[in-house]
Structure formats: C-alpha cells, structure tokens
C-alpha cells in the first residue's frame, strides 16, 4: 500500500516537473525582461514597452503590493544576447512578479 502511494506521488511529481521544465529547456516561455516602472494604465504601459522593443507591456502587482509596468518578451534560445540561462528575468506567480533569477 505504501509503495503504491509513493509511486503515485513520484509520478505526479515527474508530471509537474515536465510541465515546468520542458518549456524552459526549449526556450519558448515568456519572461519579464523589465519590471521597474510605475504603472498608471495598461495601454500606456503597453505603448511604452512596444516603443522600447518588447512584445507587450502589462501592469502587474509587485511583491510589496504596488503595481508596476512590466515589459514582456519571448526568451528564445535563438537570441544571442538573451539566453534564458544567462540573462536575469522574473517569474510571474498568480499575476505577481515575485522572483528575479
């Protein structure tokens, strides 16, 4: 009985890791490249980010409860200057920008 519970836990863990790591390995996940400006409106944020060369801009909650304009871009392995491993980026968890890795 304990072996069955343990093996189902291992299978579930492996499935979750697969859903997390496969997009990271392939380099096809969207990351936040810049998240430092105060956000007044999403259309204004989007226009600013598009002007700076990012794909999109959104107002997101920051860890301290404020709202920041975050510029989103596609972190692709084809970009020579911004690989997912070497460039700093943020992780969004439930719409909150929480981690700079």
Swiss-Prot record:
Keywords: Antimicrobial, Disulfide bond, Fungicide, Plant defense, Secreted, Signal. The keyword Lyase does not apply. Residues 1-27 form the signal peptide. It holds the Pfam family Defensin. GO terms for cellular component: extracellular region. Disulfide bonds join 35-71, 39-59, 45-69, 49-70. GO terms for biological process: defense response to fungus; killing of cells of another organism. InterPro entries: Defensin-like_dom, Scorpion_toxin-like_sf. It is found in: Secreted. It comes from the Eukaryota. Belongs to the DEFL family. This is Putative defensin-like protein 86. It comes from Arabidopsis thaliana.
